[in-house]
Amino acid sequence: PRYYLLSATSQPHFQQVFSMALGIREPWFIKSLEMVPSSKNPEKLEMRIEIDFTEGTKFQYGDSGDCYPVHDTRERTWRHLNFFQYRCYITARVPRVKLPDGKVKTVDVPWGRDGSGFTLMMEGVILSLVRHMAVSTAAREIGEHDTKIWRVLEYHVEEALKLQDFSDVNGIGVDEYSHKGHNYITVFVSHPEVVIDGEGRRRSVSKPRVLFVTQGKDKAAVERFLARFKEKKGDPDAVNVATSDMIHGFRNA
């Protein structure tokens, strides 16, 4: 069975409600919304939302702010947040534009990254889950293969690394961890900044954060961190507190 909840001829108010919920704005609009048998399990239903754009729209590409007419389109699908207990997918024709140099580029859509397979809202849920559980557990929780979860995680970690700034770090903690044998990693964290309040009590005014993680537990691990620390505007001379368990490799560093 196929249940049509909304089509181009449906009540505008119904369409507006779903557009607001999804954050869809002109020139994008919801073309159809239906419940269909799941592609993974035909005995279950899933929601399919088709989004389209107004014909004749020019789309912006790049930082210049210039807009270009649509060259062609490619159909893409993203998994969205569940609609109650039903899986929800968004499908859209994604425009490509031809630049003055002849290159054809895919424009960004407001609800998802190109090549992700998940909407930005769904990626937010994934990132929240992996903060509290293993990736394999998170994958089972949402019913996806863990390789998809790893791709989302790796992308956002790389983006976060680009924004690292160690200029305010004046305390560092070092520790090593192992998993299943002697496969060690070394973790470097910042100490929280502590101030003395008006009543003479010590109070933390910042939270500790992970600065760097690397394989091994030797002098080379510390040297790799030091290189990254300087690269991200860290000043070794400004570090007045450093703590570690003082294993041999760390003492040598």
Regions found by a protein language model. Name each.
Residues 150-241, 248-253:
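RNase H-like nuclease fold core
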Residues 1-107:
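Short, conserved DNA-binding cores of transcription-related domains
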